[in-house]
Amino acid sequence: MKKKLIFKSPLYLFMLFGLFFLNSCEKDNAPLEQPVYSDQVNFQVAYDQAFENSVYPSLILGLSNYSARNGESFELFKYSMVNPAEHTEVKVNLSPSLINNESAFHAHLDTVDKERAFFPMINWNYENLKSLKQPGTVDLSFACYINGEETDDKSLRLNYRSVNECVYGFIDNDGNYIDFGWMFAAYVNENNPSIDNFLQEVLYHHVVDAFIGYQGSKEEVMNQVFAIWNTLQLRNVKYSSITATSNPSQKVLSQYVRSFDEVYQNSQANCVDGSVFLASVLMKIDIKPFLVLIPGHMYLGFYTSEDKTDFELLETTMVGSINLNEIYEANGQVYNLNKYLGYVSLDTYNRYLNGYATLENLKMEISYNSFLKAINQNISSWNYNRSAFNNPDNVEYQIFDISELRKVVQPIGI
């Protein structure tokens, strides 16, 4: 089917969130004539109240590339102080912890007795953030230096969440809802090393001989996606509705999202898990996917043409609607085939009975027809909700084009 797809860019959300760094450089220290005391400086450290003293690794990891390219980052921390004298050099040092490397902030202050606030760049420990599978607590230590002399120190205790916890929205300090639904794209991880093993498994079943992306016809694109679908069914991947987290926050909305390896190894997925898993594989073989978000549900879309003029939809939860492994032959009989006769043509069934088709031929047809059913599952819903998708103010209906979002959102690397 030929359709025109419009997706809403998340870039305007960054302006709402205020992703700015303050770039600063060190200057020569000019010593004060009088000693400086901590009560003069009134050094304070605060963490963004909207996140209720919790650090979300997925948010930091997903936007790390945007920060690196643009010299901007979250205003999660705020340093405030009063300048005790003219022309002072300020340094705030954050000691290393489980979630960050040593981070130094520098500023040059001119006006005496003026209170200043800064939003520093934090040197996060990205590898540690990727490894945080369970919530926990971390203590951060800050030291404030005026012209090279330490004048004060502060400690801040924060909670950290699991890297699997995807923040898809929060209430800011002014009571406004900030949509972060596009963060689901961070769980699409085309760089996961396990994808190569999975693709070898797909090729082993000989549905396709190679992955060629858009180098062939639309039919060849569809066959590549079906080959992936068929392998998931042979692995007996089942639907699992687990989405809840232990997060007690009333301001931050989040959902547990399984990593690629968790789906691959445990053969369980909900609508989000299955969609980001398949999107990860499609990105790897150069077929461009998108995620479709509707109230309480997510499904997958993929372009069947490189110019994005054609696309198909796929209901990923239906991958577990059949169990190919329970169809087998023994003692001259075939077991459990009757459950799936609705997926088999009469011609193929008769050919099987007459010995002209194998049980594997039957299973392949069952799998393919389940794939076509999943392709058609959401067409009516898509057409009905088209106006909602095109409404930038309706955050419950969104389309997340992964290749477009890669400009700002990177895989979190799990």
Where are these regions (language model features)?
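Hydrophobic/aromatic-rich core segments of domains that either
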Residues: A269-N378, N383
